[in-house]
Design a protein with these regions (language model features):
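A short, glycine-/small-residue-rich helix N-cap motif at loop->alpha-helix starts
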Residues: 44-49
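Conserved catalytic core of nucleotide-sugar-dependent glycosyltransferases
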Residues: 76-147
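Alpha-helical elements of Rossmann-like donor-binding domains used by nucleotide-donor carbohydrate transfer enzymes
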Residues: 23-26, 52, 82
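Short beta-strand-to-loop acidic/aromatic patch adjacent to the donor-nucleotide binding site
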Residues: 63-74
Length: 147
C-alpha cells in the first residue's frame, strides 16, 4: 500500500507567530508523513480565505488528506499524531481538535465552552445546534459540527 500523503493549510492576516510556524515545521519534519504541499491564504476576510483554500485543494488535490491548522493555534508532533493515528476514510473522514469560545463575553470571568455541536430537529421541521458539554476527556466522539 502506498504511503498516504498530506497537505497542510492555514489562513492568516499576513503574519504568523513564531510558535505557530515552529509547530508546523516540527510536524513536517518529525511526523514521517509525506507532505505534498502547504496552502496559505492571506487576508482579513476569514470566510472568504477558507473558501479559497478549500476550493483550491479540492480542484488541485494531490494529497490524500488535508490538515487545516488555525494560525493562532500551536500544533505539536504529539497532537498531530493523535489526529493522524485516528483517521479513517470511511468512519472518520474529518477529525477536528476542540476550540473554545464563551457564551458570556461581557463577564469579567469568561467560562470556556467547546465549539462542538450536535444537530437537533426543531418544531418547524428545521434543525438547530446543541452544544456538546461537558466533553469526555481524551476521547474521540462523533459530533455534527465543530469549529
Amino acid at each position: 500500500m502506498a504511503q498516504e500523503t498530506l497537505s497542510m493549510a492555514w489562513c492568516d492576516n499576513g503574519n504568523v507567530d513564531g510558535k505557530f510556524m515552529q509547530g508546523v515545521v516540527d510536524v513536517m519534519l518529525k511526523s514521517g508523513i509525506k507532505f505534498e504541499t502547504l496552502l496559505r491564504s492571506q487576508g482579513n476576510q476569514i470566510a472568504r480565505q477558507r473558501e479559497k483554500v478549500i476550493s483550491y485543494w479540492y480542484e488541485n488535490n494531490k494529497s490524500d488528506w488535508l490538515l487545516w491548522v488555525d494560525s493562532d493555534v500551536v500544533i505539536s508532533p504529539e497532537k498531530f499524531k493523535l489526529l493522524w493515528d485516528n483517521r479513517d476514510i470511511e468512519k472518520r473522514p474529518i477529525i477536528s481538535g476542540v476550540y473554545f469560545t464563551t457564551d458570556t463575553p461581557e463577564e469579567p470571568l469568561m467560562i470556556p465552552m467547546p465549539t462542538v455541536f450536535n444537530f437537533t430537529d426543531n418544531k418547524d421541521g428545521g434543525f438547530g445546534l446543541t452544544r456538546v458539554h461537558p466533553l469526555p476527556e481524551n476521547k474521540l466522539i462523533k459530533v455534527g459540527a465543530a469549529g
